[in-house]
């Protein structure tokens, strides 16, 4: 489907991308409903990614509000295209989930015993499971070791046997998911609804990250293999169906896609004059391909880059002013103070007084968010 009416330009898409994502701050539940998915990351620099994302979109938001209020909200933690938080209705689209590997009999028996243990207690911290079963240590993804119980709980959560009931000090506390099947039973799906569910998941990803270059749309559909592995074989068909129903334009040789109901050239998509520090996982800057197309410079997330090789900083926050990401900031909270350093893609800060006033206002908002003011 091609967009009709006024020809769409890259400037239209850039303004549309910012304005549609930075909606008027609302309640926590409504903000997550509007976003559809909030990516999580455990690094605090100066707060977790999910908190840094929500502070721009939730009125009066403070660091840690999501973790504190999660048990009372209709939300789930799970893997979608990345790991994060979803409204329960979206979460249910991915379940029952068929894992990519079949458990051995021994593993299934371990899972059954753990499931019964958690069901009896209601909600369980991983250390309680480890103390009761003493599963030992296993190698983790980073080359070190972790408790085998923790790894088993992670897998049981992924398979839909458990849900995250709450967090304690950042650690997931698990409960039995209401619709959990037996751990050694193969998950089944309603084949008649598989295509519609897959389409809904693709639309959810598009809604979160639009407008999308074709390469990013392809990437997101590939990443759905993590959230819905049972429908991996349908990904190519789902991508083809998406390209048929989404609006589309080719600009400077790049194919772009966005929800068909939206008109990026509309005057309603008008970013404000504010200055904002964004998390690297914010939907405005998450797509590094789109970032370079929109703003003409390369942002890199360097938390896992050796310090001598970093160019921007450990956890550089993209710096948005109006409809441009003009640089980055490294922000830390230490000894009750906010400490900041900035870099600019153009080599120096804008001279306009409006920028400096806006930056001071953003830093004050950050202090309040972190409880420093």
Regions of interest found by a model, annotated:
Residues 1-373:
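Long, charged, low-complexity, helical-prone intrinsically disordered regions
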């Amino acid at each position: 489907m091609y967009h009709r009416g006024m020809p769409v330009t890259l400037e239209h898409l850039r303004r549309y991308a910012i304005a549609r994502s930075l909606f008027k701050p609302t309640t926590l539940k409504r903000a997550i409903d509007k976003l559809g998915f909030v990516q999580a990351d455990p690094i605090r620099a100066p707060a977790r990614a999910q908190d840094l994302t929500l502070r721009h979109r939730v009125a009066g938001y403070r660091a840690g509000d999501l973790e504190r209020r999660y048990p009372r909200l209709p939300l789930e933690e799970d893997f979608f295209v990345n790991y994060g938080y979803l409204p329960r209705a979206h979460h249910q689209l991915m379940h029952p989930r068929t894992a990519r590997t079949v458990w051995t009999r021994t593993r299934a028996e371990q899972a059954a015993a753990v499931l019964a243990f958690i069901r009896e207690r209601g909600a369980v911290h991983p250390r309680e499971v480890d103390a009761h079963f003493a599963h030992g240590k296993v190698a983790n993804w980073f080359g070190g070791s972790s408790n085998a119980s923790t790894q088993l709980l992670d897998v049981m959560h992924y398979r839909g046997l458990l849900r995250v009931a709450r967090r304690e000090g950042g650690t997931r506390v698990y409960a039995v998911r209401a619709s959990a099947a037996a751990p050694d039973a193969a998950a089944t799906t309603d084949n008649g609804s598989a295509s519609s569910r897959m389409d809904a998941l693709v639309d959810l990803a598009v809604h979160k990250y639009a407008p999308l270059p074709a390469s990013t749309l392809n990437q997101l559909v590939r990443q759905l293999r993590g959230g819905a592995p049972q429908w991996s074989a349908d990904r190519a068909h789902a991508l083809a169906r998406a390209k048929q129903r989404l609006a589309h334009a080719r600009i400077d040789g790049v194919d772009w896609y966005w929800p068909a109901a939206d008109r990026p050239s509309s005057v309603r998509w008008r970013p404000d004059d504010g200055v904002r520090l964004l998390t690297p996982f914010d939907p405005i800057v998450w797509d590094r391909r789109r970032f370079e197309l929109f703003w003409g410079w390369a942002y890199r997330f360097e938390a896992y880059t050796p310090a001598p090789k970093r160019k921007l900083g450990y956890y550089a926050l993209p710096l948005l002013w109006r409809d441009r990401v003009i640089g980055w900031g490294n922000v830390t909270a230490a000894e009750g103070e906010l400490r900041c350093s900035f870099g600019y893609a153009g080599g120096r800060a804008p001279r306009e007084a409006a920028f400096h006033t806006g930056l001071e206002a953003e830093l004050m908002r950050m202090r309040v968010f972190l409880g420093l003011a």
